[in-house]
């Protein structure tokens, strides 16, 4: 570039923003390989291990959903059990009342949960901070009381899935022939595969959201909603989108949980301890606001539950003491501490400013 007086000016350097890295490409390949290994596991593993992994997968998916809502959008909810229970009851209603195949009912439960999340959002989004948390819990209690009134679904005592429904799940005959197992074990294998898909899907969903402009908007709202709106972010629509997305995913997870259990009751389906307190524990000890945190947290939680659950009340006391200790000495969680100390990220979501090659 030459100016009017003959002086030559340097061309401005143009930078570009990259989200894809070599590490992320390797991660995708490793993730696909790991999912394929897990998918083939029923051919070699016993039924006990399969049932344990179902639990790990759906708790991981629930933790990722709560982490997306609270850790990235700043919507700290203690009412996640609302959509777990809703999904479970919708599964029973669709299967028993409408005669729909349970696998199709799992998907439909998520879609209906997403639809019902819209009017719910218009209520709870009027609240801020701790009031939002309390409001989300109240919504869950309202759902619990409502479903306790449906006599067709067992009322307050609950009901069970009929054997005709659980023994005729789509693909069960193929699984029985392939693995030479009976109907209960075949149902566990099908449930295991769906749980694996939901866990991998939840991880992928969170990762893709955080690497998008939508993820930037969520983080901006979490840090300062007023500042985000002044920059042009529609905070209500952004929060509504993530709330509905989490509701849909959580609804499908809830439907899957009670497909495996084959029995449901209002107190169990809308349990704040099982579906929110434990999930918050997983995210807190692993690391809030990181994708890796819930993975670490669910491994720790599974190990503690497997080896210490027989101690009764002492087990819950230990969980509480561990959570308090982590919050005091490693506020960013186990993974947050490791990532800060060693500068490592399994799921890189940062954007890099790259100068083009000459």
Predicted segments with their positions:
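Transmembrane alpha-helices and adjacent helix-loop boundaries
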Residues: 2-358
